[in-house]
Amino acid sequence: MLSKNVHTTDVVIVGAGPVGLFAVFQAGMLEMKCHVVDALDCIGGQCVTLYPDKPIYDIPAYPVITAAELIEQLKQQSAPFDTVYHLGQQVIGCKIDNDMITITTSAEQVICAKSLIIAAGCGAFKYKRLTLDNIEAFENKTVFYSVKDKNKFINKKVVIAGGGDSAIDWTLLLSDVAEVIYLVHRRENFRCAPHSLNQIKKLAECGKVQMIVPYQLAKLTGENGLLQEVLVTNFDGGAQTLPADYLLAFFGLAADLGPIHKWGLKTDLRRIEVNSITYETTIPGIYAIGDVASYPGKLKLILTGFAEAATAMSHCYQRVFGKKMHFQYSTVKGVLRS
């Protein structure tokens, strides 16, 4: 008899973001049992932890959908299938014996499966924090590295620091609720979509956004964690004091594959190299899909990850059942719903 912390299934999916959730659906459609492991304590990955209110425009049939809404739809889509989730757990070990893959989690759960799919996005991530004096007093009170509720910033003075897509996108998204936004970047050039930057410049013309370039953060002033002013300086010795209720710093993520690095997989710049036809890694039975997968011509899009999930799962079917999958359209097969 198996211990309560030992499980046997057909497929293990590491990562419960959008691509991992669609892989769950694909497994269910092929009548494969599935366990999912994610280091976060909730389903949704970066979509719910980093940018739940951020609009996504390139999901087919949805002219626009927020990241949180997309995750909710994917959860509903995969709900009919009896999937087991192990949340708040990291995969710390992986062994292969007689074509059976056995993983161990940080919560001492042991899962045995014929196939393993890594849909871990950019891996475990941490925000690149500010190094200003006394920053700890303001963090998670009036200084944030992500936005979970845009309503917090209604009629507030907001300083946004950064020059990439996240800084630009959140400037656009908060411009309709904030009193004013100060966009601070140490360079005059931004690393973002030209269309988005043009929108920022139009907002600057009407006073909703003030572009503070080339400047960088120098000092925060406030009491009891409540921000009052942000001092910014440039390389010529110039300085400005910006009145502020909140500071949002978007300097990117420090990503790490964590223990996956020790599995013997071939990696390339924190991504896992795969066969571009099956998405199998250099270890048979282990696949990688979504942003973590690397192959020539790769497009880092959620849509691409969905297609990779379908292909990888069909290949898993052959390992699980020992026979080639008989392809059926979902319109023929259907999905049983309670």
Swiss-Prot record:
<feature type="binding site">
    <location>
        <position position="91"/>
    </location>
    <ligand>
        <name>FAD</name>
    </ligand>
</feature>
<feature type="binding site">
    <location>
        <position position="38"/>
    </location>
    <ligand>
        <name>FAD</name>
    </ligand>
</feature>
<protein>
    <recommendedName>
        <fullName>Ferredoxin--NADP reductase</fullName>
        <ecNumber>1.18.1.2</ecNumber>
    </recommendedName>
</protein>
<feature type="binding site">
    <location>
        <position position="46"/>
    </location>
    <ligand>
        <name>FAD</name>
    </ligand>
</feature>
<dbReference type="InterPro" id="IPR050097">
    <property type="entry name" value="Ferredoxin-NADP_redctase_2"/>
</dbReference>
<comment type="subunit">
    <text>Homodimer.</text>
</comment>
<dbReference type="InterPro" id="IPR023753">
    <property type="entry name" value="FAD/NAD-binding_dom"/>
</dbReference>
<feature type="binding site">
    <location>
        <position position="125"/>
    </location>
    <ligand>
        <name>FAD</name>
    </ligand>
</feature>
<dbReference type="Pfam" id="PF07992">
    <property type="entry name" value="Pyr_redox_2"/>
</dbReference>
<dbReference type="GO" id="GO:0050660">
    <property type="term" value="F:flavin adenine dinucleotide binding"/>
</dbReference>
<feature type="binding site">
    <location>
        <position position="51"/>
    </location>
    <ligand>
        <name>FAD</name>
    </ligand>
</feature>
<feature type="binding site">
    <location>
        <position position="291"/>
    </location>
    <ligand>
        <name>FAD</name>
    </ligand>
</feature>
<keyword id="KW-0285">Flavoprotein</keyword>
<keyword id="KW-0274">FAD</keyword>
<feature type="binding site">
    <location>
        <position position="331"/>
    </location>
    <ligand>
        <name>FAD</name>
    </ligand>
</feature>
<dbReference type="GO" id="GO:0004324">
    <property type="term" value="F:ferredoxin-NADP+ reductase activity"/>
</dbReference>
<keyword id="KW-0521">NADP</keyword>
<keyword id="KW-0560">Oxidoreductase</keyword>
<dbReference type="GO" id="GO:0050661">
    <property type="term" value="F:NADP binding"/>
</dbReference>
<dbReference type="InterPro" id="IPR036188">
    <property type="entry name" value="FAD/NAD-bd_sf"/>
</dbReference>
<comment type="similarity">
    <text>Belongs to the ferredoxin--NADP reductase type 2 family.</text>
</comment>
<dbReference type="InterPro" id="IPR022890">
    <property type="entry name" value="Fd--NADP_Rdtase_type_2"/>
</dbReference>
